[in-house]
Structures are given as C-alpha cells and as structure tokens.
C-alpha cells in the first residue's frame, strides 16, 4: 500500500512447491534479471525480491552465508541480492498464494524516493558483484543474459532518479545520454529482446537502444507524473 493506492502483490496464481531444480530454473535466476515473457512488464520484474514477503529457515541463511549489503555500496536492491545468495543454496521453496502481511510504503521516507547522485556508480558495483557470483558458481549463459537484461532495464530507475534532481533539463538529458552510451549499456541494449515488450515500453527502451536521450527523458517525465499521482 502507498499513500494514494493499495494493490495486491501476486507472483504466482496458486500455492506452489518448488523443488531443487525448479528453484534454480524458476526462482533463483530471476534475482539476477528477467528473461522471456517476464520482460513484458519491466515495472514488475523485481516483485519477487522483497524479504518482507518471505520466511527463511535459519539453517539456510547460515548455509548460504548471505548478508545484506550496505546501500551505500550498491544503492538499492539489497533484498534481491540477499535472496540471490540465499536461493542459490535452497533445495525447496514454497510459495503461498495468500495475503499474510500488509506492507505500507510511505513514499516520503523511502530510500528510493529521493535523488541519489551516486546511484549510477553504486549500481555498477551491484552488477560487478552479480557478475562475480555468476562466474564463481558457473551459473552459465542464461544468468549472463538475465544480468544483461537487468542492466538494460536499469535506465528506468537511473533515469527516474535523474528526473527528480534539481538539475536543468539540459543537464538531465546529458546525464541520460552519458549512461546509455556507456559500453556496458550499449552491449545490454544490443542484446535486449524488445519483441517481448508492449508498445510503450518498446518505445522507451528503443529510444535507449538508439541513443536518443531526449526521447528517454521525455518518456521518463511522463512516467514520473504517473507515479506521483
């Protein structure tokens, strides 16, 4: 629930038990990034991540060695990174299609609601740490592609962060242009499968792919207005 609206968080349509291989195939990889049809809703790709919607066995936490990473290092997504480490050691996960927790988010106090001038650099650290996990655990090409998609989708969060800054419009567009022309992002957009996206997201990420920073900025201002209603 936010200040202006309330909605149910539905991940799977029914109670589901995931055994070891299904945990890897259907859950663990999603903490790295979206694939296939999951890309059709970029705004929902991290719905699985919050720790407030989960109960963990202490033994699993101890087995995984997972710890929350300081937001000063990775900017955001501390829940998702924690789950990436935990679910990598999970042999069985049960999803309950029931509402057991009412979570209220006060936008004015959220760590993601204000401008963060370090967010770009912090997210590069997050991506580097994810790459290290993929390499050290030999998770393979699917995980690499999922991370590639996360990087590409990330211009939404980075761009919204820029739009709420007090900088001039020209400086905001310049900052967006600098990001989408970075080699890491150019590679990500080159491999992003846009055919999964609905038309409005296809337009947004198409602008990013082609380096059209003003188009990205214009669409971000529309998105920001919708969010702020």
Question: What are the residue ranges of the model-derived segments?
Answer:
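Catalytic core of nucleotide-sugar-dependent glycosyltransferases
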Residues: 98-107, 113-141, 157, 161-186
């Amino acid at each position: 629930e936010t200040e202006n609206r309330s909605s149910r968080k539905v991940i799977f349509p029914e109670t589901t038990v995931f055994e070891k291989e299904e945990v890897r195939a259907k859950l663990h990889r999603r903490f790295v990034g979206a694939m296939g049809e999951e890309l059709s809703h970029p705004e929902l790709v991290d719905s699985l991540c919050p720790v407030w919607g989960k109960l963990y066995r202490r033994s699993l936490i101890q087995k995984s060695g997972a710890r929350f990473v300081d937001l000063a290092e990775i900017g955001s997504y501390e829940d998702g990174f924690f789950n990436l480490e935990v679910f990598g050691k999970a042999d069985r996960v049960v999803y309950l299609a029931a509402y057991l927790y009412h979570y209220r988010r006060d936008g004015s106090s959220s760590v993601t609601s204000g401008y963060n001038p370090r967010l770009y650099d912090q997210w590069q650290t997050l991506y580097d740490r994810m790459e290290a996990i993929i390499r050290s655990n030999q998770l393979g090409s699917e995980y690499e592609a999922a991370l590639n998609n996360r990087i590409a989708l990330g211009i939404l969060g980075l761009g919204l962060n820029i739009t709420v800054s007090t900088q001039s419009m020209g400086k905001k567009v310049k900052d967006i242009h600098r990001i989408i022309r970075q080699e890491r992002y150019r590679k990500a957009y080159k491999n992003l499968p846009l055919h999964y996206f609905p038309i409005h997201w296809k337009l947004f990420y198409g602008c990013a792919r082609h380096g059209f920073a003003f188009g990205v900025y214009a669409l971000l201002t529309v998105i920001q207005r919708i969010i702020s209603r």
